[in-house]
Amino acid sequence: MAVTYRTPMEDIVNCFEPATQAVIANSAATLYKNFEEQHCQYFNYYLSPLAKRKLSMAGIYLSPYSAVVHSHPVCKTLENYILYSVLPSYINSSFYFVGIKERKLQLLKSKCKNLDSVQVVNRYVTSADRMRYTNDFVPYGSYEHECLVHKGVGLDNEALRGLVGPLRRHKAKNLFFHDELHYWSSKVLIDFLDVMRPDKLLGTVVYPPELLFKPTRSLNEWCYTYDIVGDTLMFFPDGVQSEGYQQPLKGGYLLGARSLKLPDGTVYMVDVLCSKFPHHLISITKGEAAAPTHRAFGPFEAVASEALKATLSPDYPCAFPVSYEVVNKIYRYLRTLKKPDEQSAIAKLSQIIAEPSGREIDFVECFARLVIHNSSMCATIMPEQLKEFMGNWLGKMPSVLARRFSSVRAVCVNKFIRGLKPYSFTLRLNEITWWNIWENSYAWFFDTDAEVDVPEKLDSLFMGEGAGLVAHITSRPYVGTVPLADREWNALLCMDSQKLLHAMRRMFMRGAWGAHMCVISREFLLKYVEARLKSSCLIAKARRRGQHKEKLEAWEVLGLKSSDALFRAMTYLCNARLEPMFSESGLRFFLTRGRNNLYGLTNYTEGKRAVTGVQNLWSNVVHEVSTKRHKGMIRLEKARVTEQPRSEFASCVLEPEVWRDVEAALDIELGEVACACNARFVQGVVLSNQAGLNVREQVAGASVGLYTKDRSNLKWGNSELLSNGWGRSLSVWMEINSVSQKFDVAVRLSYSKETQMNVLLPSLDGIERGAGATVVNLRKCGAFIVRCARGWRLALAWMDHICLEVMANVAYGHECYMRSWGTMDVVVFLKRATVSEQVTFESAQEVGPIEGKSDSGAPGVGVNLDLGGVVGSEYPANGAERYKRVSGPGDGCCCWHSFAYLVGMHHMELKRLCTSHVFENAALNVELEQCKASGAFVTHAAILATALRLRAEIRVHNAGTGRVHRFAPKQKNMALDLWLESEHYEPQVLRNGCVIESVAQALGTRNADILAVVEERCCEEVVESVQAGLGLNLHHVEIVLQCFDIVGHCNLGDKEITLNAGGKMPFCFDISDEHMSFCGRRKDPICKLVSGALHGKMFAESALLDLENCGLKIDFEPNWNRAGMLADSMYQGATGVLGSALFNNKRNMREKFVRNVSLSLHAIVGTFGSGKSTLFKNLLKYGAGKSLDFVSPRRALAEDFKRTVGMNERGGRAKAGQENWRVTTLETFLARVEFLTEGQVVILDEMQLYPPGYFDLVVSMLKVDVRLFLVGDPAQSDYDSEKDRLVLGAMEENMSVVLGAREYNYKVRSHRFLNCNFIGRLPCEINKDDCTIDEPHIMRMHLENLLDVAEEYKSVVLVSSFDEKMVVCAHLPEAKVLTFGESTGLTFMHGTIYISAVSERTNERRWITALRRFRFNLCFVNCSGMDYQQLAGRYKGRVRSKFLCKTAIPDDLNSMLPGQALFKSEYPRLIGKDEGVREEKLAGDPWLKTMINLYQAPEVEIAEEPEVVMQEEWFRTHLPRDELESVRAQWVHKILAKEYREVRMGDMVSEQFTHDHTKQLGAKQLTNAAERFETIYPRHRASDTVTFLMAVKKRLSFSNPGKEKGNLFHAASYGKALLSEFLKRVPLKPNHNVRFMEEALWNFEEKKLSKSAATIENHSGRSCRDWPTDVAQIFSKSQLCTKFDNRFRVAKAAQSIVCFQHAVLCRFAPYMRYIEMKVHEVLPKNYYIHSGKGLEELDAWVKKGKFDRICTESDYEAFDASQDEFIMAFELELMKYLRLPSDLIEDYKFIKTSLGSKLGNFAIMRFSGEASTFLFNTLANMLFTFMRYNIRGDEFICFAGDDMCASRRLQPTKKFAHFLDKLKLKAKVQFVQFVNKPTFCGWHLCPDGIYKKPQLVLERMCIAKEMNNLSNCIDNYAIEVAYAYKLGEKAVNRMDEEEVAAFYNCVRIIVRNKHLIRSDVKQVFEVL
């Protein structure tokens, strides 16, 4: 497939011979030359790249040589385009130009020769015109034209004043206005056309077209901007404020006009001939003709926002000012990311736009957030119609509400993307007529529908259906201006003043006046009326007579004569409606029937809050005030009665006439009534009926309650009444109701209407009858009947609570009865002795008799009392056997314990809740306050508060009385039963209440709640069965389930049934042995109802296969003996506590063994921090709703895992999607094993910490197959418990059973540690690139220094035993102190390890566990009595010693691991190689992420090549023994003093040679400080200023871009010749290779991403677009210069490194690799480029080349700085030859010629760090060699950058000598005999192969030993020595004495330290 499309003509031309192509090109060049000559002067302004692209796409020619600067080049180019390219095709010599400069007209005439006779008419309109036109301009002056008189002031306009006369004199019919029409209003234009009547009028208009739909900001900011100031527009060309000018906002009306209609009906058509952004060419032609009805504008640099309307703020414009390309790219980019984020979106924006605007940044941030948090929606194929419907429907709501719905957001995003395109709009054109000139303001300041014809709409609304019959108004000319001047002025709106006055009065009465405003201010009233009139613009407030205008006063507007009349008219109604204040009324307030000012007189809270006490008191006042009084009427009737003794309790039946008297008494008023016997009865008002007196006993059909002040009992006939004391509230109540305080006995009576009772109680003993009595009626309706012994009777009644005071003289000889239609409820006060106070119920009110059911269901009779909002009653108890009591503690809180047991709360919390209740009655609050004390007994007030707070019906079964006390609130949710015996409460539950309990467990609520619902909703039969405690049949069970909408899946053992199948909530129950239990979520999978069901909670098979591939598959067969031993230990309480029979009443788990067949499980093992848990955490990211059990041996590990995956802590509600995730400990999980579902995932984490036999126990109890994973590190702490050590200690460990005889992969690389110091100290692999710090660990001595360590190290302390834990806790009480074993699986940032003498006895696994816990660093506190050196010796060979000595290797784990472990660095992957890896690595560099392809690596099957097994020649090599010191003695004298070797610059001195020993821990001192091996070579450091300046001076060359571009231009002609010379030796193929390009791109990105994520993030600043591409940063390379030539030398210049912007590298690097592949594709066999190849390939090539003669080497001086313009010309021709993109070549030219830094601009040269450095250096080296020497073709030549070596003596040639002299590149030729060891890249070349110079290797190994770094680099040194070692005697024979001695010492060091070697090279040095 072609990279770019070519037209057929292009293909044909490319097929021609070059000569033919040149002929065609000449013709095209001539055409282009002529075109450029014509247009260059108009379109040669310097433009930005964006402006170039926009203008070119708009069809505007731009000169390729655009260098002329201008303040606003874009708008100037557009103006020239309209004026010089578009306009000439529409005009001729007949046109008159108006408002144009002479210079522009002359340019136009020079371009168009037919415009020579065009004349210009200019005039002064603005002050700037005086300077705009030339000095020879003469303004016209003339007499006023008659047309001006005809138009009156119409043509007296600045634009027309000096224009009409000259044009009429010239009889101009064709006109052109230059940039002027946008200043004219539509009226001015119509007046002008009406006077001039031109045939054609052309004009240029500058007006932003987007203003037609009213955005306040420009949508083409690259071209222009504008501001709206009032009704004017400030237009800024190119956004340059200083070049802006002001014009009318309405100036664009012609863009929306179709025609113009003059007063006489003449029509002018309007057309837009050309529209380019804000510049338009408009044509106005005379005569009506066909024309379009709509006009379109666009596209703009914006996208429509209509689709996102529901998510936007109301003031957001109709378009987003962001280009379509930006939105499109960012959306597609975010959708391709696996983990999109806002940073990536902003980085992508910076990549697309170098300098984005603030509006673009804001939009991208918000848009990215919207896209990221809302998934895409299908609306085309398989549309999500429900989601779309909900989104559209909810989107109709206000945006502030709509955007909160996810469906609305998803639909909005979908609509936005589906309709995404550059914003444009279509405008409906209108006709501008002379009579409806709106000045174009209508379109701007009002919203109008483009499809509505406003005049027709108004006509239809005004005329109704007959609007169509009315002829439209036709236009006609004016007939003169006289009527306009003489016509009388009339108001447009007339209003009746009388109606206006009425309206004003109503407004005043309702809004300003109040019913209690006694005085009205005259001034206030007048100001009020004036303000109201002023606010209306439709009411005439002035009188006009001719030219005189007179202001009207307010009263004149209202039709009144004076202000007094206004005041009277406004206030005459106020006095009639005035209401007196309460303070003014006094007592009259209570007597008047009219009520006003009643706010606050209700007995309920009117405000938001009110204090309860105030509310209660106020309700009493309200009751008192609201009592009605009527005039009384007393009826006395004498009756004949026989004198006979009567008993008080004798039946007293009132005659019908007496009842009539009672009924009549309902209308009488209270008063003092006298009997015929002079007995007096005084009636009074009961202000409060809340007596607070209860009835306790039954006497002769009445409920009686006795209250005495002295607490004495009284006799009533044969019965003794027990005194209830005398509460303080009773005295208060008596005082409120005006009952005399002399009474000290109160009797509460409650009886039915059938019972007749003399309320004066003559049978009550101990009463002083002469003291009189007071009887209080507590009922609202009733009547007192008084019988006199003389035969008189009185009927005294009242409609409300009354009291009757019987005077002392009527105590004898009278009877008093109470009659009512309901229950009688009275209180009788009598005189006796003083009685003491006792707290009782103080707010009881009888509410009626009980006619309900008792416990047994039999009818019971009792009395209901309203006790503070709770109805209290009492009835006989029956059926106590239906309940079972639960024993409770008798600690004084037994009642609270009972309540707490029934409701499931803590008793103290429940007590605090209930005792905090506030009653309406103060006495109850006092009594409740006493219950708050600790150990206080519960009173009735506490029970009432509990009933109210819990909304519970409380039934107290009193064992002493055999009755049930019932307390029921008005709203109840549950029923609670208590047993009271001997002042001790116990909770009662129904016998056989398993149904209630099962339903409660299923719904997660309390039994009491379920019971209350059952009693309320179920039928009587079910309720009786429940209350009887006899159990329920299945039919009744189904009825109960129906109440809660539960589908009950019931397992009956032999069968399964479903109850209430129509319910909504399915639950499983088990019914066996007449007992029902809830199965919960742990459904038994054996149950047929769920067995085999596809429950949809299984993980995807692909995800599990990937996971299983990371571990070892094991067919595990459970051992019932091992499982049984662990089960017995747990049953006995030796192992754990949850499975104990003693502590938790558990059964032995042996009974649950059901499985003896094998189960496939997978073991995933790896070292600490290897990512084992991360595998499952990643799995859970896609496990929403899936079933998983994660088991941890430690509670801390379980909680840590919960926090990591985002699960709630214990007791919290599970998040959506996590309902089926269970994180448990090992004991809790055993209770779930038998209920696991088939196929679910079970993970046993930290498998080495489980007790022996645990895996056998789990598998033995499994009823179904599950996906079981064992995860852990067998090398860490194992299980150990002192309690079961004797029982389980003899059993084999779990790890040995599972892995003992198997070979398995063990991941040895750890990702936990971020400190380089841990490398070599821990037995694992640590990637150095992952480490971000390099800090040594801290070592402290003695316990007292524990307090001195840094705070971060004090947070966690690890100890080896529990005894040490106590010691550390005493010193650091705030620290988290853990034993080594307890810390297993946990990770900390910093911490401390405490070492004591006991620590020595800790096994290796626990030591490994402790040392691996800390990511950053750790501190040791040594309290063992030994120093650290002694400690290392004492622990020799152990993990602790290897940590201190830095000698740990992964092989140390072999002794701790069971079976045969195969160490691997990574877990294997099955499918999707590298998926998401790139994106994760680039998380810290969002800018680079936009430059890198994020696709995954292709799956390529690697072909296995057969390995050739050859018998290598081997024999022993005898090396002469030579000590290291004797080797050193041969050259030590060559080391000069430091002061002679360093370089001085001013007062600065270089620092390249060391003279001190290193302070690195573990370093070895091989020599004295001044003669260290490191001193042999210079060391360059980035901090060495002198070394850096030396590098700048030697290796960099500076120039300026202009000079370098000129040099390159002159050198470009040599490029093709150089390339042809190169192609003679290396015949490159020019065709494009797609595979090479893909591989090159992939290889570059892989190399770029091979660094760690931390390193990439640290260099993210290089990716930001704020770093200019043509600016680089210069560094000096930090390195030890270990070339052989650098031994014993003085200081040398550093190697400079240039740091480029990442965009530059990503631009060029893939193509450089592509060129390299093209070179390697055709490279001859005898040429070798050492790039991307190993030493084995070099060795094999050298053997083929037979380097056995005189060889040629080239040594270049300043090679990089010598890569001048001639070499670059060769590079450019090479890129063109390989058909690389031309824009890439231009970018390469730009970078090479324009690159600069803080030091200045560079000349053309090569830089280290440039993408093409090595490749082009090598190619330049090859080209120079081909031109410098006579190459025959059979030479073997190897190249690598600036290094070259040929196998023969190459003869120089003079053929290109003249050209080579021009090059900066110079070479020193060396001819080396093979015995003198020719060198290439530091390797000696010989016929037998390659080998490294031994002195270099030895000295570098000694330097590593001095730095304690040998373990990190010995592999590399061993590889270098191995080539000479394998050559044996062949290499020794070519070495001199010094080299042999060095070679021996190299081999000796390697053999002694071969245990540090990690690679296979170790085998070379092992003895066969």
UniProtKB/Swiss-Prot annotation:
<dbReference type="GO" id="GO:0008234">
    <property type="term" value="F:cysteine-type peptidase activity"/>
</dbReference>
<dbReference type="GO" id="GO:0008174">
    <property type="term" value="F:mRNA methyltransferase activity"/>
</dbReference>
<feature type="binding site">
    <location>
        <begin position="1166"/>
        <end position="1173"/>
    </location>
    <ligand>
        <name>ATP</name>
    </ligand>
</feature>
<keyword id="KW-0696">RNA-directed RNA polymerase</keyword>
<keyword id="KW-0378">Hydrolase</keyword>
<dbReference type="GO" id="GO:0016556">
    <property type="term" value="P:mRNA modification"/>
</dbReference>
<dbReference type="InterPro" id="IPR043502">
    <property type="entry name" value="DNA/RNA_pol_sf"/>
</dbReference>
<keyword id="KW-0548">Nucleotidyltransferase</keyword>
<dbReference type="GO" id="GO:0006396">
    <property type="term" value="P:RNA processing"/>
</dbReference>
<comment type="function">
    <text>Protease: Thiol protease that cleaves the polyprotein.</text>
</comment>
<protein>
    <recommendedName>
        <fullName>RNA replication polyprotein</fullName>
        <ecNumber>2.1.1.-</ecNumber>
        <ecNumber>1.14.11.-</ecNumber>
        <ecNumber>3.4.22.-</ecNumber>
        <ecNumber>2.7.7.48</ecNumber>
        <ecNumber>3.6.4.13</ecNumber>
    </recommendedName>
</protein>
<dbReference type="GO" id="GO:0003968">
    <property type="term" value="F:RNA-directed RNA polymerase activity"/>
</dbReference>
<comment type="similarity">
    <text>Belongs to the potexviruses/carlaviruses RNA replication protein family.</text>
</comment>
<feature type="active site">
    <location>
        <position position="994"/>
    </location>
</feature>
<feature type="site" description="Cleavage; by viral protease">
    <location>
        <begin position="1472"/>
        <end position="1473"/>
    </location>
</feature>
<keyword id="KW-0693">Viral RNA replication</keyword>
<keyword id="KW-0067">ATP-binding</keyword>
<dbReference type="GO" id="GO:0006351">
    <property type="term" value="P:DNA-templated transcription"/>
</dbReference>
<dbReference type="GO" id="GO:0016887">
    <property type="term" value="F:ATP hydrolysis activity"/>
</dbReference>
<dbReference type="Pfam" id="PF00978">
    <property type="entry name" value="RdRP_2"/>
</dbReference>
<dbReference type="InterPro" id="IPR002588">
    <property type="entry name" value="Alphavirus-like_MT_dom"/>
</dbReference>
<keyword id="KW-0223">Dioxygenase</keyword>
<dbReference type="GO" id="GO:0003723">
    <property type="term" value="F:RNA binding"/>
</dbReference>
<dbReference type="GO" id="GO:0039694">
    <property type="term" value="P:viral RNA genome replication"/>
</dbReference>
<keyword id="KW-0511">Multifunctional enzyme</keyword>
<dbReference type="InterPro" id="IPR003323">
    <property type="entry name" value="OTU_dom"/>
</dbReference>
<dbReference type="InterPro" id="IPR007094">
    <property type="entry name" value="RNA-dir_pol_PSvirus"/>
</dbReference>
<keyword id="KW-0547">Nucleotide-binding</keyword>
<dbReference type="InterPro" id="IPR027417">
    <property type="entry name" value="P-loop_NTPase"/>
</dbReference>
<dbReference type="InterPro" id="IPR001788">
    <property type="entry name" value="RNA-dep_RNA_pol_alsuvir"/>
</dbReference>
<feature type="domain" description="OTU">
    <location>
        <begin position="883"/>
        <end position="991"/>
    </location>
</feature>
<keyword id="KW-0489">Methyltransferase</keyword>
<keyword id="KW-0645">Protease</keyword>
<feature type="domain" description="Peptidase C23">
    <location>
        <begin position="990"/>
        <end position="1080"/>
    </location>
</feature>
<keyword id="KW-0347">Helicase</keyword>
<dbReference type="GO" id="GO:0032259">
    <property type="term" value="P:methylation"/>
</dbReference>
<feature type="domain" description="(+)RNA virus helicase C-terminal">
    <location>
        <begin position="1317"/>
        <end position="1454"/>
    </location>
</feature>
<dbReference type="Pfam" id="PF01660">
    <property type="entry name" value="Vmethyltransf"/>
</dbReference>
<dbReference type="GO" id="GO:0003724">
    <property type="term" value="F:RNA helicase activity"/>
</dbReference>
<feature type="active site">
    <location>
        <position position="1075"/>
    </location>
</feature>
<dbReference type="GO" id="GO:0006508">
    <property type="term" value="P:proteolysis"/>
</dbReference>
<keyword id="KW-0788">Thiol protease</keyword>
